[in-house]
C-alpha cells in the first residue's frame, strides 16, 4: 500500500514588535498586535523586544512627564479606542502625591523572563503588562506589580523573582535595548518583518490600525515570496 509523503508546514517568517512597557501608544496598539498575532499565527512568529524608552541611573518622578500625559492620554484614547484606568490617572493628575519613578528596565527584564516560559505568548504578556500599568495603575518598578501575572500564567514565583534581580537577566534586557537601536527603531510601537539576512520590511511605525498593518504584512510577505522565487 502506497503512503503519501508527510506534508511539512511552510516556514514562518519573523515579525519583530518593538515596544516599551511605558509607551502609551504601544498600550493603544495592544489590541491591534494581539489581533495580528492571532490572524497570522500560521504565517508569522512574533518576537517582542523592549526598547528601553525610559532609562536613567537616577529615575525621575512621574511629575516630570505628568503634564504631557494629562493631554496625551486623551489623544491615545480618541485614536485607538483604548481606555486608561482611574488608578493610573490618579498618579498623572496627582503627581505630587505619587510615589512613581518610571523606569523601563524592570518590565523589560520581566518580559525577557516570561519569553523563556511561554515564547508563543509574548504579545499577550506585553499587553498584560501595559494593562497592569495603564488601567490597573500598578507600578512596574515594584515587584508586587507582577505577582498577579505570575499566577495568571502559572510561573513559579521564586524562579521569577530570582531572575528579576539577577545580573544575567538585566544584561539580557540591555541586549534587547541594544538590538532595538541596531534595528534603527526611533519610536514605539514599531513592527518589522525580517526578510533575508539584515533586510526588514516596516509594517507599522507609530500607532497603526489593524487594516493598515494587515495590508502591509500581506504586501511584505508577497514581496519576500517574489524575491525568493527570483533568486531560486
Where are the model-predicted features located?
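Residue-level recognition of the N-termini of beta-strands and the immediately preceding loop/turn
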Residues: 13, 44-46, 189
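N-terminal leader/targeting and pre-domain segments
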Residues: 2-4
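Structural alpha/beta surface segment adjacent to cysteine/selenocysteine redox centers
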Residues: 30-133
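C-terminal cap of thioredoxin/glutaredoxin-like
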Residues: 17-18, 22, 29-38, 128-232
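A broad, low-specificity signal for short, low-complexity segments enriched in glycine/proline
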Residues: 6-10, 70-74, 110, 149-154
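Extreme N-terminal starter segment of soluble prokaryotic enzymes
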Residues: 10-16
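A generic fold-level signal
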Residues: 10, 105, 185-186
Amino acid at each position: 500500500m502506497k503512503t503519501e509523503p508527510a506534508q511539512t508546514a511552510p516556514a514562518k517568517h519573523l515579525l519583530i514588535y518593538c515596544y516599551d512597557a511605558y509607551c502609551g501608544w504601544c498600550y493603544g496598539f495592544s489590541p491591534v498586535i494581539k489581533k495580528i498575532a492571532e490572524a497570522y499565527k500560521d504565517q508569522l512568529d512574533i518576537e517582542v523586544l523592549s526598547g528601553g524608552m525610559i532609562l536613567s541611573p537616577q529615575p525621575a518622578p512621574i511629575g516630570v512627564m505628568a503634564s504631557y500625559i494629562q493631554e496625551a492620554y486623551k489623544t491615545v484614547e480618541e485614536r485607538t479606542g483604548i481606555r486608561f484606568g482611574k488608578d493610573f490617572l490618579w498618579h498623572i493628575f496627582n503627581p505630587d502625591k505619587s510615589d512613581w519613578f518610571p523606569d523601563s528596565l524592570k518590565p523589560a527584564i520581566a518580559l525577557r523572563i516570561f519569553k523563556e516560559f511561554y515564547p508563543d505568548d509574548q504579545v499577550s504578556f506585553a499587553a498584560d503588562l501595559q494593562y497592569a500599568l495603564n488601567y490597573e495603575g500598578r507600578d512596574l518598578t515594584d515587584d508586587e506589580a507582577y505577582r498577579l501575572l505570575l499566577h495568571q500564567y502559572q510561573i513559579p514565583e521564586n524562579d521569577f523573582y530570582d531572575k528579576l534581580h539577577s545580573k544575567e537577566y538585566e544584561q539580557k534586557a540591555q541586549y534587547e535595548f541594544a538590538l532595538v537601536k541596531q534595528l534603527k527603531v526611533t519610536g514605539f510601537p514599531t513592527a518589522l518583518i525580517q526578510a533575508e539576512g539584515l533586510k526588514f520590511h516596516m509594517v507599522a511605525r507609530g500607532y497603526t490600525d489593524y487594516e493598515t498593518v494587515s495590508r502591509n504584512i500581506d504586501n511584505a510577505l508577497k514581496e519576500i515570496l517574489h524575491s525568493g522565487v527570483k533568486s531560486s
